[in-house]
Amino acid sequence: IFGDGSFSDEYVYKEDALIAKVWEAVKYREKEHNEEWLVIVLTDHGRDELGYGHGGQSDRARAIWMSTNLKEVNGQFAEPYLSHADVNPTICKFMGFEVPRDLAFESDGSSFYGPRDIYDLQSHNYDNKVMLSWKVDQGKGNARVFMARDNKFAQGQKDDWQEVATVPVSDGGCTVDLGTVDSKIYKFAVQTDNTILNLWNPRDPNRPYSPNQ
């Protein structure tokens, strides 16, 4: 409520002192009880250009900072779009949790812990096809591409995921033919040995594809 200035700085220092106490407790647990802890500290949002408010769409309002005690992070941690969504998959990978496939396909983030095969999944519509592309971090193995023609998951049901392609990770993408069945939305998930990415590809139901249009 006070914007940029000494008052805000004072409370940043106070918060930093509280986090320091947590960090000292973590180091004690690791030393005295042979435990391994993952610590991630981040803000919930940014502020506007003058240091006020939240919920805006400016670069500063949308930007957060993040810090972790992980000694080794992958390239995801350095991406400009690193976000809150990356925290959950990072925790799951650190803890060794086996996330069910249907849940993993819904996760919007990527782990910044452990190896990363691909990142930055994009799509482009061309006639009745969707051209998927991704950037390669480690060019080994294959990428399995899955597609769902609905979003039953939103109603607590299972989506009908169909594997539509398998290509080398190093190809950096593939083209998926949507066939003759129209849908309002297509969901895609790309799965490699170490990474799962997803995106939604909306379609205008009032303008179905026709080779004659």
Regions found by a protein language model. Give the residues of each.
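Edge beta-strands of extracellular beta-sandwich domains
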Residues: I196-Q213
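Histidine-centered active-site microenvironments of extracellular/periplasmic hydrolases
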Residues: V41-K71, I118, P202
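Polar, surface-exposed loop/tail segments
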Residues: L82, M95-K129
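Conserved aromatic anchor
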Residues: V130-G139
